[in-house]
Amino acid sequence: MMKYSPFQDEPSSDNNNNGQNSESQPQSNAPKHPISVFFHLFFKIVAVAIFILSSFVNIGFVLTFIIVTLSSAFDFWVTKNVTGRKLVGLRWWNQIKEDGTNNWVFESVQDKSQVNPAESLMFWVPVLAFTAAWFVFSIISLFGLSFLWLVVEIVCFLLAGANLLGYIKCAKDARKKVKGMAQSYIVGTIVNQAINRV
């Protein structure tokens, strides 16, 4: 039997590998998606490490720019399309309509028990920390009048910041949906009780 998943390409089953029902076992804090966690951190760390390493080792601006920008672009794609839905059960995208207006689209799992708290923490902390790091690097380069490096830092900050903004909006939308479902359930229960008394 399949559990509900809002992500059509990712059904999850009720049974684990041993054939035992997963409901009878307590939820572990161990990551359920270690490969996703690895790649969620890998591209972020590579981009920042190469950027910092280029200050101490003469790698060259062009090579550093290419490696850091590509790592940040890969990180943007992996975070937006893979790790967000696997680690925190959220997915977002932005559609531009024919009239030129933007439309943010959000998806989230309805059953928050599917989200592992440890994985959620491993998702949010790096998203916030690396966005803040690129912002700090940008400020340092701005005041240090290092405008070539500022270009790299702004590109990386914008990529990281777009994911941060998208996931914050997505998380707010998910909370709003849960609140709306709870309110409609309560109202429905009260109305049914009132009708049954009449």
From Swiss-Prot:
GO terms for cellular component: Golgi membrane
Entry similarity comment: Belongs to the TVP23 family.
Keyword Zinc-finger: no
Keywords from the UniProt entry: Membrane, Transmembrane, Transmembrane helix
Top-level taxon: Eukaryota
InterPro entries named among the record's database cross-references: TVP23-like
Ranges that cross the membrane: 48-68, 132-152, 154-174
Annotated segments matching region Disordered: 1-29
Pfam families according to UniProt: DUF846
Localization of this protein: Membrane
Mode of membrane association: Multi-pass membrane protein
Name recorded for this polypeptide: Uncharacterized Golgi apparatus membrane protein-like protein 1
Keyword Ion transport on entry: no
Polar residues bias spans: 13-29
